[in-house]
UniProtKB/Swiss-Prot annotation:
GO terms for biological process: cytochrome complex assembly. Residues 30-160 are periplasmic. This is Cytochrome c-type biogenesis protein CcmE. Belongs to the CcmE/CycJ family. It comes from Vibrio atlanticus (strain LGP32) (Vibrio splendidus (strain Mel32)). The keyword Transferase does not apply. It is found in: Cell inner membrane. The lineage of its organism: Bacteria, Pseudomonadati, Pseudomonadota, Gammaproteobacteria, Vibrionales. Pfam families: CcmE.
Length: 160
């Protein structure tokens, strides 16, 4: 093999290994940031025949059980139960809860599984209807906006 071919082969191999290393690092990073979504029933009973491992990062969504919210008087630590149609899962959270958080409300918590039915959350998101409007905004709109009056032609549209 002449020197020119050796140089080309070296360049091609360097490019190949560089691309392979880049793809490998990307897959590793995506794996580390991937949080699987579970409901409380799926967490306890398993999802597709597989239960998450203790220490695994995950997201869980469900309804906050009425009467289960417990706040620590000394800190921002809160614990509450989350349920869907089956078993309950306890969520432990240290931080300020969203304004829309309340008992009976849907939430999504992101955290780490501590044991089979307990999650140490580092983020809690309150779910709400897409038509949600803060009461202050609704009152202001009632005062300044009159409801639109449609004619029968406008209500029927372009139906021909």
């Amino acid at each position: 093999m002449n020197p020119r071919r050796k140089k080309r082969l070296g360049i091609i191999l360097a490019i190949f290994f560089g691309i392979s290393a880049t793809v490998g690092l990307m897959v590793y990073a995506l794996n580390q940031n991937m949080d699987l979504f579970y409901t409380p029933t799926e967490l306890v009973n398993g999802k597709d025949g597989k239960k998450p491992e203790v220490g695994q990062r995950l997201r869980i969504g469900g309804m906050v059980v009425v009467g289960s919210v417990s706040r620590d008087n000394e800190s921002l630590r809160v614990s509450f139960d989350l349920a869907d149609v089956g078993p309950k899962v306890t969520i432990l959270y240290d931080g300020i809860l969203p304004d829309l958080f309340r008992e009976g409300q849907g939430i999504v918590a992101q955290g780490v599984l501590k044991d089979a039915t307990t999650i140490e959350a580092f983020e809690v998101l309150a779910k709400h209807d897409e038509e949600y409007m803060p009461s202050e905004v609704a009152e202001a709109m009632k005062k300044t906006h009159e409801p639109l009056q449609y004619t029968t032609e406008q209500k029927e549209g372009n139906a021909q």
